[in-house]
């Protein structure tokens, strides 16, 4: 019914006009014809899910410039998701998408928690929608937190249905909610149990045994011990029931300020140094109270500074690092680059892509996080000193940096099970406020800060730079970021373990009823079939070979890289403010920003960290040892699979990293086949090999953003938009121009 003209290019001539122009607007299409194209599709409801409102004869637009093509169907809203029920086969022409199918969220489903902003189109003008509406839009545009943009035309829908569906979507995605009203509890009550995967070995850190196991694994049990003083959350609602502190620390000290001002263990290095975190004491104005706090902190200092403990270096993240407002502001600007309404908008912004990207500061924030993690790693690895991370509640940037350092230093955290256990330990049990930071209850936009997404982006930089070092793939990180907004898993929907345990329904249930059992996101079989799960595991990853006892004695606590570092780096320098020279700095840092602002330690380790960084990168990479990311400007890249996957124009058919991976997998399968033949000749038992994902075998037909990108169309726009040609001058002039020099400054 609608025609599309080709776009000419080249020469200095104007592009030819389309050979066919349609004079029939969508409004003139007969209703009977529309009803024929609309197919009845069954709405799949999860246990406990209820239909709230719906509208029929809704047109879902294909995101393409100047073409109002799409598919008709029903738009429904449940207490779990917004769903479009149409003819998916005509709307999607993508075999890879169907093979990597999420069993919980369909292609045309959006969880209510994933909705970021809702816009209405009135007379071709887009306006944000809030609260009660006096006039209802003819088009509905939904921006999602996973950066999808959905367009729905309501011109052919009955007026009563338009009011019902628009009001329902606005109310259920933007109105403040109570925690117990989340779909999480409805689902848990309906399923009456959990479908756990027996192969899931993720350590949950909800028992003393889990913490003791981690201490033994990292050889930290000599200097640190697990305490149960907060069992039943008698001391603090913020802390987990069990955690680890220095062995000589009295339990009375933990109780004194509800866990504030206590050094809590995160991880131990092979050389005996450890990573610790501490929350600040309550701010006091009274001199007497300040003196009490000073005496308390002085006692803590003496406890952690005497032998066998190493010297301590503090990192005050509240005053000398990123602020939450910086992160929030940067991501708000950054995400706008990918919330594209149509291909015309994409091409218009393409010419100023780099300036927009730079002005958002998101990549610079990632670089600063990686740089700070390198500095902490240098203290632990090269200088053999403990590092104490200080933050107001020790639940935001402490979680990010402590996790990032462990990913860089501990190969176990680069396995899938180890990475999931790390998130459980540092984020879930560490008291990160997922409920507030993701704004699941829509109670405070100011509290919504993507700290966890920033962490995943930092990890992706490492995965991108060192693929063989990680058992999981970037696809794993992408679906993990999507799982933040799926309210059937409890992992990312509470502010603390205490909040989760007290809202399991125990106090409100009858004596005959059982408490609710909530699912964990780590059981990936809930979301994906086994074939799809193969894309979550890196087929090029090889586990660290186990050494025999004789070899273990010779290299027990050594990294390969440590021996190549200058021996002088392990000695402390009086210029760096370690506590042996500046015994009052811990106390000053913890007594509030009023004092800590006077202490300038933002770049104390710059010189030594640079030497450590350059020395490491001059050696061959040990994928099972220490990893340091490249942090030079061009090395920090955009996580294309997550941020660009819904933009067709950003795809490369048969190109990108997926094409390279496909060829590597073909070679890997051939090597495995030859190995099996050799073993068969020697009458050995066949070895178990990792199966290369069949979805990647035809890499020529796949998109560079596989397995998420849609391949139903390709833009006919030129690589450089016409607006860019006009700005740059003629073609001859463009060919003679030199690249513009941009000073990136010091890394």
Curated annotation (Swiss-Prot):
Cellular component terms (Gene Ontology): sarcomere; sarcoplasmic reticulum
Compartments it resides in: Cytoplasm; Sarcoplasmic reticulum; Cytoplasm, Myofibril, Sarcomere
Biased composition regions of type Polar residues, renumbered to the chain: 562-572
InterPro entries per record: MTMR12-like_C, MTMR12_PTP, Myotubularin, Myotubularin-like_Pase_dom, PH-like_dom_sf, Prot-tyrosine_phosphatase-like
Domain Myotubularin phosphatase: 205-643
Span list, region Interaction with MTM1: 449-558
Pfam families: 3-PAP, Myotub-related
Sequence segments annotated as region (Disordered): 548-575
Tissue expression from the record: Expressed in skeletal muscles (at protein level).
Positions of modified residues (Phosphoserine): 564, 601
Keywords: Cytoplasm, Phosphoprotein, Sarcoplasmic reticulum
Domain of life of the source: Eukaryota
Biological role: Acts as an adapter for the myotubularin-related phosphatases. Regulates phosphatase MTM1 protein stability and possibly its intracellular location. By stabilizing MTM1 protein levels, required for skeletal muscle maintenance but not for myogenesis.
SUBUNIT field: Heterodimer with lipid phosphatase MTM1. Heterodimer with lipid phosphatase MTMR2.
Similarity field: Belongs to the protein-tyrosine phosphatase family. Non-receptor class myotubularin subfamily.
Protein name, entry field: Myotubularin-related protein 12
UniProt source species: Mus musculus (Mouse)
Lineage of producing organism: Eukaryota, Metazoa, Chordata, Craniata, Vertebrata
């Amino acid at each position: 019914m609608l025609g599309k003209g080709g776009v000419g290019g080249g020469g200095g001539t104007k592009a030819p006009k389309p050979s066919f122009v349609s004079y029939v607007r969508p409004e003139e299409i007969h209703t009977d014809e529309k009803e024929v194209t609309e197919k009845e599709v069954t709405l799949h409801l999860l246990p406990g899910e209820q239909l709230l409102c719906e509208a029929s004869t809704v047109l879902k637009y294909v995101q393409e410039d100047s073409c109002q093509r799409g598919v008709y169907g029903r738009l429904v809203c449940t207490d779990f998701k917004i769903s479009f029920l149409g003819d998916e086969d005509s709307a999607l022409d993508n075999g890879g998408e169907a093979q990597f199918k999420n069993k919980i969220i369909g292609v045309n489903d959006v969880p209510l928690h994933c909705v970021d902003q809702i816009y209405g189109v009135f007379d071709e003008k887009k306006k944000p929608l809030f609260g009660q509406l006096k006039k209802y839009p003819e088009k509905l545009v939904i921006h999602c937190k996973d950066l999808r943009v959905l367009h729905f035309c309501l011109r052919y829908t009955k007026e009563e249905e338009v009011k019902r569906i628009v009001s329902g979507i606005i109310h259920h995605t933007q109105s403040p909610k109570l925690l117990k009203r989340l779909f999480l509890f409805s689902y848990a009550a309906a399923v009456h149990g959990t479908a756990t995967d027996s192969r899931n070995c993720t350590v949950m850190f909800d028992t003393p045994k889990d913490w003791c196991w981690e201490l033994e694994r990292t050889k930290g049990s000599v200097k640190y011990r697990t305490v149960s003083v907060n069992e039943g959350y008698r001391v603090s609602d913020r802390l987990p029931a069990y955690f680890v502190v220095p062995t000589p620390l009295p339990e009375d000290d933990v109780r004194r300020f509800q866990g504030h001002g206590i050094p809590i263990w995160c991880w131990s290095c092979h050389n005996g140094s450890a990573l610790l975190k501490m929350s600040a004491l309550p701010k006091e104005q009274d001199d007497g109270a300040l003196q009490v706090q000073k005496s308390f902190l002085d006692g803590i200092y003496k406890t952690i500074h005497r032998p066998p403990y190493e010297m301590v270096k503090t990192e005050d993240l509240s005053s000398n690092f990123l602020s939450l407002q910086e992160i929030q502001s940067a991501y708000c600007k950054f995400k706008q680059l990918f919330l594209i309404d149509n291909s015309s908008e994409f091409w218009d912004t393409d010419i100023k892509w780099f300036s927009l990207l730079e002005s958002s500061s998101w990549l610079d924030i990632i670089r600063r996080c990686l740089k700070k993690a390198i500095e902490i790693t240098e203290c632990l690895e090269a200088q053999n000193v403990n590092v104490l991370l200080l933050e107001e509640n020790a639940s935001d940037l402490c979680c990010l940096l402590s996790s990032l350092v462990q990913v860089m230093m501990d190969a176990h955290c680069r396995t899938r099970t180890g990475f999931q256990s790390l998130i459980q330990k540092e984020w879930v049990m560490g008291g990160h406020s997922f409920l507030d930071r993701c704004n699941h209850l829509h109670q405070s936009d100011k509290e919504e800060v993507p700290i966890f997404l920033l962490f995943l982006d930092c990890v992706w930089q490492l995965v991108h730079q060192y693929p063989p070092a990680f058992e999981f793939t970037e696809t794993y990180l992408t679906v993990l970021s999507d799982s933040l907004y799926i309210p059937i898993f409890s992992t990312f929907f509470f502010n603390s373990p205490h909040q989760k345990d007290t809202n399991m329904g125990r106090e409100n249930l009858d004596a005959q009823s059982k408490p609710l059992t909530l699912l964990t996101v780590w059981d990936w079989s809930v979301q994906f079939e086994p074939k799809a799960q193969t894309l979550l595991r890196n087929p090029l990853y090889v586990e660290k070979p186990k050494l025999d006892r004789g070899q273990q004695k010779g290299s027990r606590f050594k990294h390969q890289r440590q021996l190549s570092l200058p021996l002088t780096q392990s000695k402390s320098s009086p210029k760096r403010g370690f506590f042996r020279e500046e015994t009052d700095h811990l106390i000053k840092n913890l007594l509030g920003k009023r004092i800590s602002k006077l202490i300038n330690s933002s770049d104390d380790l710059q010189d030594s960290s640079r030497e450590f960084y350059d020395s490491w990168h001059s050696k061959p990479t040990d994928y099972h040892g220490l990893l340091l990311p490249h942090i030079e400007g061009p090395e920090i890249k955009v996580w294309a699979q997550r941020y660009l996957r819904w933009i067709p124009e950003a795809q490369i058919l048969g190109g990108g990293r997926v094409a390279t991976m496909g060829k590597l997998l073909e070679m890997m399968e051939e090597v495995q086949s030859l190995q099996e033949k050799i073993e068969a000749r020697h009458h050995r038992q066949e070895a178990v090999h990792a199966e290369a994902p069949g979805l990647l075998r035809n890499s020529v037909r796949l998109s560079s953003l596989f397995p998420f990108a849609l391949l139903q169309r390709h833009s006919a726009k030129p690589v450089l938009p016409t607006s860019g040609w006009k700005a740059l001058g003629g073609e001859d002039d463009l060919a003679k121009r030199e690249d513009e020099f941009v000073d990136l400054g010091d890394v």
